[in-house]
Structures are given as C-alpha cells and as structure tokens.
Amino acid sequence: MSEQKRRTIQIAISEDHYEELQKALELLKGTQLPFSTTVEQFVELILSNYVATSNKISSLAKSGFDVASLQQELEKIGNLSGVDDNLKGFLSELLKTSRNGFSNPNKDGKKNDDDNNSSSKS
C-alpha cells in the first residue's frame, strides 16, 4: 500500500461482514501483517491484491494460458475434506468472480459491461 496520490472512498458493508474482516485480520496480525493494521488498511490490501491477481489472470488468458485448468485446480482445493469452511467460501467466491470476469471475455479481451456495472451485495 504505497503513499502515492490517494483517493478516499466509502463503502457500506453489513455488520456481519465487518466482523468477519476483523476476525480474519486478527488471525493475520503479527504473522503476515503488522499488529497496527486497521480493518480499513486490510480492505485496501485485499482490493489491491484482487486487482493485481485479476490483471495477472487476464494477462495469462490473453497469452494463451489455460485459465480453466487453473480454476479446476482451485475447485479441487476447495472441495478437499477438512478444509476450513471460510476458506471454502473464499475460494468459491474467487471462482465465481474469475469465471464471470475471465472465462468469457469479449473479442477485444475486455470484461463484459455487466462486470463493470456490478455492485457489492453487502
């Protein structure tokens, strides 16, 4: 999270989602994230990682990489017995998003208008 020119945005999420973010953040503090990390910084990190991952997947798809195979491997991981339900849920959402955004790109490689106009259902 760089200190480049920054823009402030506001998002409204349910109390349940906020509590889930807090719990996930607490598990990561001290191991993968500094103890001083706030929920807002955590959300910024999640969003920036999502954008970077999306860009990489798009790049792979454009270069001829078999993104569908990658999705199948992620599904196998998510379907393993003993895998934490939260991880399964996260992988499920990741797969839905990647299917919608990358499995059926337009001829010019851009996302569908539906992807650009979608909003959070939180």
Curated annotation (Swiss-Prot):
Annotated region (Disordered), positions in chain? 97-122
Protein name (Swiss-Prot/TrEMBL): Uncharacterized protein MG202
